[in-house]
Amino acid sequence: GFLDIVKGVGLVALGAVSKS
């Protein structure tokens, strides 16, 4: 659902921040 997409994007964003 929509919330699943939001959660997925949030996890990807956190992952990108952690890598940098």
From Swiss-Prot:
Organs and tissues of expression: Expressed by the skin glands.
Keyword Secreted: yes
Gene Ontology biological process terms from the UniProt entry: defense response
Zinc-finger among keywords: no
Superkingdom, taxonomy of origin: Eukaryota
Chief place where the protein resides: secreted
Subcellular location: Secreted
Cellular component terms (Gene Ontology): extracellular region
UniProt keyword list: Amphibian defense peptide, Antimicrobial, Secreted
Protein family per UniProt: Belongs to the frog skin active peptide (FSAP) family. Cruzioseptin subfamily.
Function: Has antimicrobial activity.
Protein's UniProt name: Cruzioseptin-15
Organism of derivation: Cruziohyla calcarifer
